[in-house]
Amino acid sequence: MDEAKEENRRLKSSLSKIKKDFDILQTQYNQLMAKHNEPTKFQSKGHHQDKGEDEDREKVNEREELVSLSLGRRLNSEVPSGSNKEEKNKDVEEAEGDRNYDDNEKSSIQGLSMGIEYKALSNPNEKLEIDHNQETMSLEISNNNKIRSQNSFGFKNDGDDHEDEDEILPQNLVKKTRVSVRSRCETPTMNDGCQWRKYGQKIAKGNPCPRAYYRCTIAASCPVRKQVQRCSEDMSILISTYEGTHNHPLPMSATAMASATSAAASMLLSGASSSSSAAADLHGLNFSLSGNNITPKPKTHFLQSPSSSGHPTVTLDLTTSSSSQQPFLSMLNRFSSPPSNVSRSNSYPSTNLNFSNNTNTLMNWGGGGNPSDQYRAAYGNINTHQQSPYHKIIQTRTAGSSFDPFGRSSSSHSPQINLDHIGIKNIISHQVPSLPAETIKAITTDPSFQSALATALSSIMGGDLKIDHNVTRNEAEKSP
């Protein structure tokens, strides 16, 4: 309280001093104005009074400068004419600015800042323009982020016009790889062995059936998403589109679809087929490859496929009635309820559904041991009386042919498959269309595909497994 009282006392004394100075200056100003309006008294006098007249004029000018210093602003009619007066007024304004600066500095030291800053108010439109530009930039950034978030999983592209697709097409170049699976299913979703939670659905253009969106719930941080939609041409066909990579171990019931989608995605990412319309029939599974060069106007291969939004996509068609496709369908059914006599040992510690070129495998191929010993330790011996549709994969390397996990050869002649080591004496010869050399190399050099295939075989057999590995992984990598 004492400090406040002392400050109020100093403030009152300063105000009284300012008021007193103002009254004195006002009186001087009135006197000068009265003299300015009167006729000059020195004009009728002689030449001997010129010197005194000049002195009086200098005194008047000095008084005018004092007035200008106190008030700072005068009307044009009150300013004396002549270039000398204008120069003096400029000097007066500069002196006034210096004096005001000194006064403000002194008052700020005493805690009595009474000055008004005119600089911020000199051009208010400039500040408004800057604020408007900043607001416009923030709105543009938020709109761009909103568009990117809507297009991150293709939620909006199928329902838009072709003009919107033309604008979004450059962003599709960096989108993730998708694996679309077409299957005949009466249930709302296909039982792929994984755990999913539905978080939304949307009506797409040209399809009365809604498109449902699911996310993997095995791990909270799993980025894998799945889109499910019925085909508009055939309501019995369910189209499931997978996107992302699991970052957690998968249950054994999910490894069948994991191996199929992993192999398909690896083929696409390895560049086995550069044409967007190319298709390969691998044991009855119709692989349709579509790269980044998709044009927005033709949605040709599967019109209602959720993956037709510009993502690099592989389509696995399980709807055909090919006899060679039945083993894969039975494999899916068996994986949904795995046999009890298959040991879930540490031979396959990491079961990752890999949609990218990753070296994570479903089995441990390292460790310096023989892979066949690992199979024998995990599964024992295979039942020689059990005929599996995948027995053609177990083969020896023939002269002049490269190893193919699908039982095919890149050479023109038909391969010979020797099955003597599992009790079959005859040699089966069959003619199949050859695959591109790049596709064979991409498949054989992918350890995740080989390990996933071995795991699938062990579950299909339901018994002991013994595989004669005449071709090791290093030899497969060196093969043409």
From Swiss-Prot:
One of its GO terms (cellular component) is nucleus. InterPro entries: WRKY_dom (IPR003657), WRKY_dom_sf (IPR036576), WRKY_plant (IPR044810). Keywords: DNA-binding, Nucleus, Transcription, Transcription regulation. It is found in: Nucleus. The keyword Nucleus applies. Residues 57-66, 84-106 have a biased composition (Basic and acidic residues). The keyword Transcription applies. Residues 30-108 are annotated as: Disordered. Residues 185-251 bind DNA. One of its GO terms (molecular function) is sequence-specific DNA binding. Transcription factor. Interacts specifically with the W box (5'-(T)TGAC[CT]-3'), a frequently occurring elicitor-responsive cis-acting element. This is Probable WRKY transcription factor 61.
